[in-house]
Regions:
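An N-terminal, well-structured beta->alpha segment
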Residues: 1-92, 169-203
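Short beta->alpha junction loops/turns
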Residues: 40, 74-75, 101, 142, ...
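Gly/Ser/Thr-enriched, mixed-charge loops and adjacent short helices
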Residues: 2-21, 133-266
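Conformational gate/switch positions in structured elements
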Residues: 30-31, 128, 207
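Catalytic-loop motifs flanking and including active-site residues across diverse enzymes
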Residues: 43, 47, 81, 104, ...
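Gly/Ser/Thr-rich helix-start
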Residues: 28-34, 72, 120, 135, ...
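Short, flexible active-site loop motifs that bind/organize anionic cofactors or intermediates
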Residues: 34, 98, 140
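N-terminal small/polar loop signature for handling phosphorylated ligands or for N-terminal nucleophile
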Residues: 3-5, 61, 68-132, 219-268
Length: 268
């Protein structure tokens, strides 16, 4: 009786694995899904394990580091998912660096390349609607992995790779600040700011509630008053009701701000 019961359980688990793996398909620059439906912890953990295994397999002979950076954007539960995958990355024999706050994907890519670590996993859905979330994989050069890589990740998932998570072990780094300091090492930001003031140019930057919010202000050490103004820098998981993509149809607040600035200038 126990034999047949276990056999039935195995069959059901196999069906579940097939269902899970069939919903995981990589698209442009990563895997994405709707939060709570196809993007859930069960699917994400499988993708993370397969991604880590493939990063080790393909690049361990090209980089000595066993460190993986985990970054995340400002979407609903992004930080929670980022912290939740740490035990699975650790279980693959890799060390974790966790971003201290929300961060852009380019910042993660720069950090990986400059510190010569194995790669990065970024919890983000880029420009997709608010109810989406996803995972981007970056190789040791900070670049997006290619289609051959993601096909291998999908193959590993279909094989039913399951790794038991272990106790979280990670270090926290300010990835955004690292990027800002790198830019400052190349450019004289005070000179740029002074030139903008001299030319009487005011710059408006629409963060669209995204991960770049307040970065420009930090880049100029907070000395941007009357020269650079941020728009929609506060956190909003709904992104003002539109996808966070800089298309003309989604930039009403920026357009209105510019029109108001023009009207004020004409009055003076």
């Amino acid at each position: 009786m126990n034999y047949y019961r276990n056999l039935n359980l195995t069959r059901e688990l196999n069906k579940l694995d097939q269902t899970v793996s069939s919903t995981i398909k990589f698209g442009t620059d990563g895997w994405r899904g709707i939060i709570g439906f196809d993007f859930n912890m069960a699917n994400l953990s499988r993708v993370v394990v397969a991604s880590c295994q493939e990063l080790k397999f393909q690049y361990s002979n090209r980089v000595k580091s066993k460190k993986i950076l985990i970054g995340y954007d400002r979407r609903f539960m992004a930080e929670h998912f980022a912290k939740s995958i740490i035990p699975f990355v650790n279980a693959c024999g890799l060390e974790v660096i966790l971003s201290s706050s929300f961060v852009t994907t380019p910042s993660c890519s720069l950090y990986v390349r400059e510190l010569n670590i194995l790669g990065a996993l970024v919890i983000t859905a880029s420009h997709n609607p608010y109810n989406w979330l996803g995972l981007k994989i970056k190789n040791f050069q900070g670049s997006s992995v290619n289609e051959l890589f993601t096909k291998e990740v999908e193959r590993r998932i279909k094989l039913g790779n399951i790794t038991e998570p272990i106790k979280s072990n990670y270090q926290i780094e300010d990835i955004k600040q690292f990027h800002i300091e790198k830019i400052n090492s190349y450019f004289d930001m005070q000179f740029i700011l002074d030139r903008l003031r001299k030319m009487n140019i005011k710059v408006f930057i629409d963060a669209m509630h995204g991960s770049s919010a307040a970065s420009i202000n930090k880049l100029f050490n907070g000395n941007t008053q009357s020269v650079i103004q941020g728009i929609r820098e506060e956190k909003d998981p709904y992104f003002s009701g539109n996808p966070p993509e800089p298309l003309i149809n989604y930039l009403d607040e920026l357009k209105n701000t510019l029109l108001q600035k023009k009207e004020r200038d004409l009055k003076h």
